Amino acid sequence: MPRKNYICNLKPVFNPPKNEKKRSNFIDYAMKKASEIDVARSKLNYTLLAIDPKTGNILPRFRRLNEHRACAMRAIVLAMLYYWNTNSNLVEASIEKLSDECGLSTFSNSGNKSITRASRLITDFMEPMGFIKCKRKKTQSSSNYIPKKIFLTSNFFMLFHISQSTINQYLSEQKQSIKNLKKEKKIFISFSDIRVISKLDEKAARNKILNALIKYYSASELTKIGPQGLKKKIDIEYSNLCKLYKKNNK
């Protein structure tokens, strides 16, 4: 293959899979930032020292980004963000998956897949530069590459100007939001047998829910909720119990 044609996809683009669950607002925000800024030409790519992840020593000879690798980086940064778990920092996708969805995988005439373009970008550039951390995964695969667990670092987010304090603020708000949601969705009535609900008329069931709510919330919380808010919670809990009863009696 002529040297000028050795790259199969000159302009790789991340194409997220269809019918995937919706990503968090923060991931949407981060992906938007990363798409608006040329992450491959960030000053960090020229000012950070490349470190050998195995020894911790500075790499004296280090290959910087050529245009083909820069194009690959622009695509794969978005893919990593898309699959990023905000709680563990883990990218929940293999290198092969990232390569496939960014259009970086190639096939030989015999049908063998190569993900070298993606794997070398990750192991030879992004990891030494400190944008990600990689851990080897134990596998029985006979492939000619080693799948890894990829974790995003604070330097990764600095590529598109998102600071660690911004991430921490989001995580704090997310934690509080989940806590509030669990509190809202909590079922206050525990029946030893779900069929007991069939023996209660609506008024009795609602009174039982009301008593449970009064026991659950403090006086100040009940004041803040107010009569209308309390009525709404009773409606929600009564509806949940009815659905639960119907589900178990199909």
UniProtKB/Swiss-Prot annotation:
Family: Belongs to the IncFII RepA family.
Gene: repA2
Name listed for the protein in its UniProt record: Probable replication-associated protein repA2
UniProt-listed NCBIfam families: RepA_IncFII_LM
One Pfam family it belongs to: IncFII_repA
Superkingdom, taxonomy of origin: Bacteria
Function: This protein is essential for plasmid replication; it is involved in copy control functions.
Keyword terms of this UniProt record: DNA replication, Plasmid, Plasmid copy control
A Gene Ontology biological process term: DNA replication
